[in-house]
């Protein structure tokens, strides 16, 4: 299998969206930690907690703890610090938490010699423009994402999670140092599930996206390694 980390293509984060440890480890044991990153979201963290994060870290994996903190600044400060203590590689907060919350999260990492990347979630890939209007925000989804991207950049965060279609413009506006993580990656034959804003791996490379998050396309595959190889080859 080609290693995307040594080529000019997006690096791959596998979303461990399972309801039990046995199923998760069945996939983890097939993966090379020098090639793939792992994402732990709310489901697995709620079931298995900090211990599971530490176990995966000890296996040599870089862990993206995707808990999307969104609370008052003091709570987010303490939660961010606690998460960083786990030795994770990347951590997410919600950009819509506002300037004070984002700055508080960034401050929480100052005492760490090797702090995790702090990433702000702009809009979920399941999010539709109509949902903005329902909560009284009368701008386009693209404009909303760009505003939150600028806010996160101004607050000193390392990057954002955003749908692929906006990534190209964000890279142009904020440069290559500002990391872009994009879920909703599908190859042609994949099901969409509940995601609306999707792109192909090839487009992700074209848009200079830094990391692509792949979940159900892999976790529900009968042959996940073959599927991953297909995804990597599609980016060549």
Curated annotation (Swiss-Prot):
It comes from the Bacteria. PROSITE patterns: OMPDECASE. Belongs to the OMP decarboxylase family. Type 1 subfamily. It comes from Buchnera aphidicola subsp. Acyrthosiphon pisum (strain 5A). It catalyses: orotidine 5'-phosphate + H(+) = UMP + CO2. Pathway: Pyrimidine metabolism; UMP biosynthesis via de novo pathway; UMP from orotate: step 2/2. The gene is pyrF. Keywords: Decarboxylase, Lyase, Pyrimidine biosynthesis. Catalyzes the decarboxylation of orotidine 5'-monophosphate (OMP) to uridine 5'-monophosphate (UMP). One of its GO terms (molecular function) is orotidine-5'-phosphate decarboxylase activity. Homodimer. The keyword Lyase applies. GO terms for biological process: 'de novo' pyrimidine nucleobase biosynthetic process; 'de novo' UMP biosynthetic process. One of its GO terms (cellular component) is cytosol. Pfam families: OMPdecase (PF00215). This is Orotidine 5'-phosphate decarboxylase. The active site is at 68 (proton donor). InterPro entries: Aldolase_TIM, OMPdecase, OMPdecase_AS, OMPdecase_bac, OMPdeCOase_dom, RibuloseP-bd_barrel. The lineage of its organism: Bacteria, Pseudomonadati, Pseudomonadota, Gammaproteobacteria, Enterobacterales.
């Amino acid at each position: 299998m080609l290693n995307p980390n040594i080529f000019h293509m997006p690096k791959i984060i596998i979303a461990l969206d399972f309801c039990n440890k046995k199923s998760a480890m069945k996939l983890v044991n097939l993966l090379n930690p020098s090639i793939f990153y792992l994402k732990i979201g709310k489901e697995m963290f709620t079931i298995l907690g900090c211990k599971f994060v530490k176990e995966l870290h000890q296996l040599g994996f870089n862990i993206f703890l995707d808990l999307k903190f969104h609370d008052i600044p003091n709570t987010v400060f303490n939660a961010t610090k606690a998460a960083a203590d786990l030795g994770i590689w990347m951590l997410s907060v919600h950009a819509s938490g506002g300037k004070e919350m984002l700055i508080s999260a960034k401050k929480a990492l100052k005492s760490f010699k090797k702090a995790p990347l702090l990433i702000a979630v702009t809009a979920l890939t399941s999010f539709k423009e109509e949902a903005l209007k329902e909560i009284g925000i009368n701008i386009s989804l693209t404009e909303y994402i760009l505003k939150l991207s600028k806010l996160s950049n101004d607050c000193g965060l390392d990057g954002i999670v955003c749908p692929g279609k906006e990534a190209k413009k964000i890279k142009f506006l904020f440069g290559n140092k500002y990391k872009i993580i994009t879920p909703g990656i599908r190859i042609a034959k994949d099901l969409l599930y509940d995601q609306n804003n999707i792109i192909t791996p090839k487009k992700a490379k074209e848009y200079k996206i830094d990391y692509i998050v792949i979940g159900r396309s892999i976790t529900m595959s009968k042959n996940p390694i073959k599927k991953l190889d297909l995804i990597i080859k599609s980016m060549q």
